[in-house]
Amino acid sequence: IVFVVSMVPIVELRGAIPIAEGLGLNIFWYYPIAIIGNILPVPIIYLFARKVLEWGKDKKIIGKFFTWCLEKGDKGGKKLKESAGNNGIFWALLIFVGIPLPGTGAWTGTLAASFLNIDFKTSISAVTLGVLLAGIIMSLGSKIVAWLGWVGVIAIVAVIAIIVIASILIKKKRK
């Protein structure tokens, strides 16, 4: 179940790891399985996403939209390469995939890289490292929830929020 859930778009390992933790599975068992399941579709997505757009650009119903996607992607990719360079693109993609927020997983990152025409090696390595980072964050978060329960987590988040708000107010007051 962990392997299959980690391959599902949007859910990915962000859903698979908490499920595994909830089932009481061992982290040394579920972490690599979730990672492999999440990374497995990445090269396939990269290689075929752009090809689907190129195939569809001359089709009657979808042609205009697919052409727009390709043109927008090429323009955005060139702009991104000029402003950030390959190194900047690598780190941006890694962070985008690695911070486990809704809609920022391996599928979305790989689709974006493919549409933006970012090279294969940069895309796959950044997404893979991002998946590893997201897996670590989700595993730690799941363990914390398992140890403290939701009430404990909410209490910690509330304390952090109060500290952040207090520090902002103190800085504003000093000015």
What positions do the PLM features span?
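Hydrophobic alpha-helical membrane segments of integral membrane proteins
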Residues: 1-40, 47, 79-142
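Membrane-interfacial helix-loop-helix
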Residues: 1-2, 23-97, 145-175
